[in-house]
Amino acid sequence: MKKLTIAFLLLSSLSFAYTRKEQIQENLSKMGIKQAIIDETKKIDYEIRDIVAFENDETVIGEKLNKLLAILKKDERNYIVSEDIITIYESKIGKDYEKYLDLFTKYTPYEYEKLFANMVYYRGIGKKDKSDGYYKEIEKKYNNTPIMEIVKIFNIANEDNRQIQIKKVLNLLKSEDVKRQVGMADEEVHSMNLTYTLTEVRKYYNDGKIEKAVSEYINNVVNANVSNEVHEYNRLKETLLLLNVLMINEEITNKKLREQNKQKLESTYISKEIKKATAKDADYLDKYLNEM
């Protein structure tokens, strides 16, 4: 499950050509789901993109969940909506979601997700032996494949080792075929890259490697080949990461390097969008961040 597989990956040299909207349209239309429902699914999926990381208002969460449940009622084959419901139940509500897990595993077009979803579910309810059984089944069926490399991430407890594994997966995700095989759209992959990069930036900063922290962001995010649509999907994450890196950059003592970095940081899509919005409303950034 994409939102449950929060593994957070990607390299700056990736070529993006498979958006979340395209994925939803392609997969749901193949299943014969009505276009009106597909359009509703695209809309709500976009609306809840930040709910796991940033939304804590129970009223807002409840409203989004009710919208999802209403869409699912129209066609139970809508595995995208089942997945989104599972994500909210698991991350925000803590309620048992086995009913929706059954629907998801019944209709997802990605065979490995049926096993992976059960692995995550049984781990979450404390049935480790059963969860491990699903992991072994995945290992047997998908050994030496990109799918297995992604799943391995969830069995690595040590952060440094997990980052190494994620980097390995990033290289695999350079392939458009691999992205489609594992069902990861551009927006999700970029989101993973942002989180991966945040972990690296934090690590270098805590180790006193200020210049390296900034260069990591520049290499992974500034130089990424990402469409404006992908940027917008991840706007909040990008904004927060950029603001943090801008502050870190100010601690660099080499003035020339600091200014060079600043120019690169301010050339990004998100930086330009912030400047445009701030020019219209001086309080834009405070208002935007307070909406979290």
What are these regions (language model features)?
Residues 62-72, 96-107, 129-140, 162-178, ...:
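Alpha-helical repeat scaffolds
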Residues 1-20:
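Classical Sec-dependent N-terminal signal peptides that target proteins to the secretory pathway
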Residues 36-48, 61, 75-84, 107-117, ...:
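Generic helix N-cap/helix-start motif at coil->alpha-helix transitions
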Residues 17-83:
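N-terminal leader/linker segments that initiate helical-solenoid repeat arrays
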